[in-house]
Amino acid sequence: MATCLLMSTFTFIRCSVLKWGSGSSLPQEQKEKITKGPGLGDFISGEVESTDSWEDYMGKLRLEKGDKRLRLPPWLKKEIPIGKNYHSLKGTLRELNLATVCEEAKCPNIGECWGGGEDKTATATIMVMGDTCTRGCRFCSVKTARSPPPLDPNEPVHTAEAISRWGVDYIVITSVDRDDVADGGSAHFSECVKEIKKRIPSMLVECLTPDFRGDMEAVATVAQSGLDVFAHNIETVKRLTPFVRDPRAKYDQSLQVLSHVKKTVPDMVTKSSIMLGLGETDQEVRTAMEDLRRAGVDCLTLGQYMQPTKRHLKVQEYVTPTKFKHWEEVGGEMGFAYTASGPLVRSSYRAGEFYIKNLLNKKRTEATLDTSSQES
């Protein structure tokens, strides 16, 4: 799966969408944090060991020759609650025959994201074009096949119907790779966006897409579908790409996809993600970030890779929260509009959606003001 959403157990997708207004119970301090942009603390919820224990952790963080696997450090241990909305959301998905990357990628955050809570609305990242991928990335737990079942023509309508029932205002649509389909499924992807916008015009839609085999017409089809954020993940650094991703997923090809989106729709907010802990060096991470900036990428997320099953790539290193904070600062210095970097950060992470939602609303307001001034 080329989009892969920083897949594997790495797809700890944190997709809860928080809504506030005049009647919100959110404290003012938390509202300000979200408006200004998140820090590591904003990305971690549930019961996590005290940060005092992080710096004192004496366990091994790097895999050495002969080691079977690394022990999970304290900063990656948290409670996984299941809220009252969990079963309702799951029932909607089953009724409409839809798949989510939350389930297919065995995301351990599924209970929290789907469950919601007093201050947040449950949501999920919808995975369209089926639950079977034509590619086999070595970090991803989504099932694969050369010839998956045909695309469901009713899926765009069903997707819009499901989302309308959830009452959210920001949704992420991703997909498996469909190399068996002529256009890679770009027209189908586009129809999903159009149906959502037709049913809920105010909905902010982020699409996390495949590379469409480098077919730039297919990329443009999705970019011009009416979405608000175009996301495509490079997943890892250039040197590790042939080892980590499917051979058909090329590092430079992914950069070209992101660049072409900006050429097609210059004002489009673009986004990408990098997994850490696969054996990359600091210089390689920095170079990948620089490559993304040159491609015009606005938003970047970095998070810890975790091995989904014994058949997948082993974790080579558990990156510390301090190091993730360093990369967040580097991202800001490089000029990314938004950099989310932390052990539990995932490419569709909740706090990122807050920030991007504010960015998009600001753009809408500016566009309205420009139109008004021109008319006057």
UniProtKB/Swiss-Prot annotation:
GO terms for molecular function: 4 iron, 4 sulfur cluster binding; lipoate synthase activity; metal ion binding. Keywords: 4Fe-4S, Iron, Iron-sulfur, Metal-binding, Mitochondrion, S-adenosyl-L-methionine, Transferase. The keyword tRNA-binding does not apply. It catalyses: [[Fe-S] cluster scaffold protein carrying a second [4Fe-4S](2+) cluster] + N(6)-octanoyl-L-lysyl-[protein] + 2 oxidized [2Fe-2S]-[ferredoxin] + 2 S-adenosyl-L-methionine + 4 H(+) = [[Fe-S] cluster scaffold protein] + N(6)-[(R)-dihydrolipoyl]-L-lysyl-[protein] + 4 Fe(3+) + 2 hydrogen sulfide + 2 5'-deoxyadenosine + 2 L-methionine + 2 reduced [2Fe-2S]-[ferredoxin]. [4Fe-4S] cluster 2 binds at C133, C137, C140. Binds 2 [4Fe-4S] clusters per subunit. One cluster is coordinated with 3 cysteines and an exchangeable S-adenosyl-L-methionine. Its main location: mitochondrion. This protein may be expected to contain an N-terminal transit peptide but none has been predicted. This is Lipoyl synthase, mitochondrial. It comes from Branchiostoma floridae (Florida lancelet). The lineage of its organism: Eukaryota, Metazoa, Chordata, Cephalochordata, Leptocardii.
